[in-house]
Amino acid sequence: MLIVLSLGGSILAKNLDPDRFLKYANALRDISKKHTLLVVTGGGEAARDYIGAARAMGADEVTCDYIGIEITRLNARLLISALGHDAYPEIPSNYPEASKAMTSGKVVVMGGVTPGQTTDAVASILAEYLRADLLTIATSIDGVYSSDPNCDPCAVKYEKISPEKLINIVMAIEMKAGSKSPVDPVAAKIIERCKLDALVMDARNPDLLVEVICGEAAKKSPVSCGTWITAKK
């Protein structure tokens, strides 16, 4: 399968721990033995810190976005270093470059691309552009809930939902102050328009990422650590 993985900066780059990068690199190696893999890295806490500092100095939002993109690309560079010869050595700056890099047979790693888009959105657009078989959004939340579980103790987790239902959930959550959706609205719309199979999962344990993608992805069977998004009945 051709898989695009959105790897959240909050789980990859937590405390900039080299061992964490190496563990994710090992997981990605294992996945790439069975699948063609492209990874989009998030910015995590470092991106938020830099953007916060820029805003405090009066930077406009486009500048803040570019700062965030640079941090995601730094995380991509660190992950490439951890992967060594198993990674494509350069960071694609756009979707055609990523497509070309994919032909190398290596794990392709990239960061943000365009101001105003999260790396989840970048990953979903990349998956659409490449006609990927699966988009995996690896985060610290174990799937999609009816509302933000951090704010609502009665939130219900879904094993499988349609893209249309995902959009309704995402928009409802985003409208509530202090609430955060596991998938951003742009990514949700891309998933809907291209009828892309996607998995939102808790990937704080890199080994679990391998287990799910290599073991359950082809079957689309329920997983305890995530939610499937599929247009297929």
From Swiss-Prot:
Similarity annotation: Belongs to the UMP kinase family.
Specify whether rRNA-binding is a keyword of the entry: no
List the gene name. pyrH
**Protein name as annotated:** Uridylate kinase
- List its EC numbers: 2.7.4.22
Sites where the protein binds UMP: 43, 65, 113-119
The listed locations are: Cytoplasm
Q: What does the record list as GO biological process?
A: 'de novo' CTP biosynthetic process; UDP biosynthetic process
**Main subcellular location of this protein, as a coarse class:** cytoplasm
* Substrates-to-products reaction catalysed: UMP + ATP = UDP + ADP
A Pfam match is AA_kinase
Gene3D superfamilies with a match to the protein in the record: Acetylglutamate kinase-like
Q: Pathway involvement?
A: Pyrimidine metabolism; CTP biosynthesis via de novo pathway; UDP from UMP (UMPK route): step 1/1
Residues annotated for ATP binding in this entry: 9-10, 44, 48, 139, 145, 148
Q: Which organism is it from?
A: Methanosarcina mazei (strain ATCC BAA-159 / DSM 3647 / Goe1 / Go1 / JCM 11833 / OCM 88) (Methanosarcina frisia)
Q: Name one GO molecular function term.
A: ATP binding
Keyword check for Nucleotide-binding: yes
